[in-house]
UniProtKB/Swiss-Prot annotation:
UniProt feature, compositional bias: Polar residues: 123-134
Organism: Caenorhabditis elegans
Keyword tRNA-binding (UniProt): no
GO molecular function, one term: sequence-specific DNA binding
Zinc finger (FLYWCH-type): 140-195
Protein name: FLYWCH transcription factor 3
Length: 420
């Protein structure tokens, strides 16, 4: 069956698998490469659409989970992280000068109920400043021992890399120290103490192990976990005057169990180790069975796309265009060896459209040097120097065969049709 009958059979729609096999076997390397490229692009588009669809579904599920978590935190009173402004003295006993009030911001775990009760109590204090209820601090700050003096935790730096401590007598003593977030050493001291260090009798109730005291390091006397244990139950979870004590205890147990479940889930997720895959340096040769499967897949793709069959038949050896949207000033050369019939075209990008840039790009590709200008082959006996006028007539993509057998006489053979 000749080519004309194959074309007529394809146009009439009577294409069979046998016809497709015969047709694909007669395609040259350029046409097969174009067919494979179009098939790969088609598969890539399908995969991209599926990935985008999965990504949207994951985002929707994540958004629903976040909304459900917020709803649960509001209805079930799951602990949330809020900033609590705390002072060491009673609001009634604080002086009017703002400079003498030493307070800072800490992060505590409290419930939505506690926030609402705190706002109600604050409104009551503002409406009745002479309230009969005594002021009680909400917690105990972390205390450390350094250079025979006691320091109280102040705050963390804005980048969460350092912690700031101030002297225990913070209202009268200006001494400060800075420590790293992940180490118990002092990296900076600010000013000096204006009072003598506390006596051994004053530090007796801390049970200090002086054997662990190191020069330049701090010794924690009550860490964040110990601080919570030192607080009485009435300060850990504030209770409303109208709420029963038994009900609040059950609520605390429920919140604690919920937080334990969330922490265990977080720890399990954090324990996952990333897996890194590395492609092999050398790939094994493709077997005949795999080649047959690839040909059958391409044949099926060819049978399903009538426009592709018509496009391949009408090309008739025309040069492919890989960069249709390239700018007119750009130049890409596909270079092959003139003395090898099966030589593969290698892509070379040229920085500027002139002979010097073309020669320099070819030299970098071949790892050779030519001291003379490139020659353009016109016929078997005529070779002329490559001029700027010739280069200006070139397209953005040009196929050439290079004869570099003579060191200072490189000849360029222009390719206009792909060989069958």
């Amino acid at each position: 069956m000749n080519l004309a009958s194959q074309i007529s059979q394809a146009k009439t729609g009577n294409a069979t698998m046998e016809w497709a096999k015969n047709y694909v076997s007669k395609l040259n390397d350029g046409q097969l490469a174009l067919l494979q490229k179009m098939y790969a692009d088609h598969q890539a588009k399908l995969k991209a659409s599926e990935d985008e669809k999965k990504k949207k579904e994951m985002e929707e599920l994540k958004m629903k989970a976040q909304q459900q978590a917020i709803l649960d935190s509001l209805t079930q009173q799951i602990p949330i992280m809020v900033d609590v402004l705390r002072s060491s003295t009673s609001p009634d006993s604080q002086p009017s000068s703002s400079s003498s009030v030493m307070s800072s911001t800490d992060e505590d775990q409290i419930t939505v109920k506690d926030v609402l009760i705190g706002k109600i109590n604050k409104a009551q204090r503002q409406s009745s400043p002479n309230s009969s209820k005594p002021y009680t601090p909400r917690g105990i700050r972390e205390r450390v021992l350094f250079d025979e003096h006691l320091y109280v935790f102040d705050k963390c730096s804005y980048d969460s890399k350092k912690r700031f401590f101030r002297c225990e007598r913070k209202n009268t003593c200006p001494a400060r120290i800075h420590t790293p977030f992940d180490a118990e050493r002092v990296i900076h001291k600010v000013q000096v103490h204006n009072h003598p260090p506390p006596t051994t009798f004053d530090l007796a109730h801390y049970n200090i192990d002086y054997g662990k005291v190191k020069s330049g390091h701090i010794l924690s006397l009550n860490g964040p976990q110990q601080t919570k244990n030192l607080l009485p139950p009435s300060l850990l979870t504030p209770k409303s005057d109208l709420e029963d004590e038994t009900l609040s205890t059950k609520t605390e147990q429920k919140n604690a169990s919920t937080m334990n479940i969330l922490l265990s889930m977080t720890n399990n997720c954090d324990g996952r180790k990333p897996i890194t895959l590395r492609l092999p340096d050398l790939f094994n040769k493709i077997s005949e069975m795999e080649i047959h499967d690839m040909e059958m897949t391409l044949t099926k793709f060819l049978l399903e796309n009538r426009e592709l069959r018509t496009d391949l038949i009408s090309r008739n050896g025309d040069l492919p265009v890989f960069f249709p949207n390239a700018h007119n000033d750009e130049l890409v050369l596909f270079v092959a060896d003139q003395h090898e019939n099966d030589s593969v075209f290698q892509m070379i990008r040229v920085s500027e459209r002139n002979e010097k840039s073309i020669r320099q790009a070819i030299q970098e590709h071949l790892q050779k040097v030519s001291n003379r200008s490139l020659m353009m082959n016109i016929s078997s006996k005529i070779n002329v120097p490559l001029s700027q006028q010739m280069i200006d007539q070139w397209r953005t993509e040009e196929f050439i065969r290079l004869d570099s057998s003579k060191p200072n006489f490189w000849k360029i053979h222009h390719v206009s049709k792909l060989q069958d």
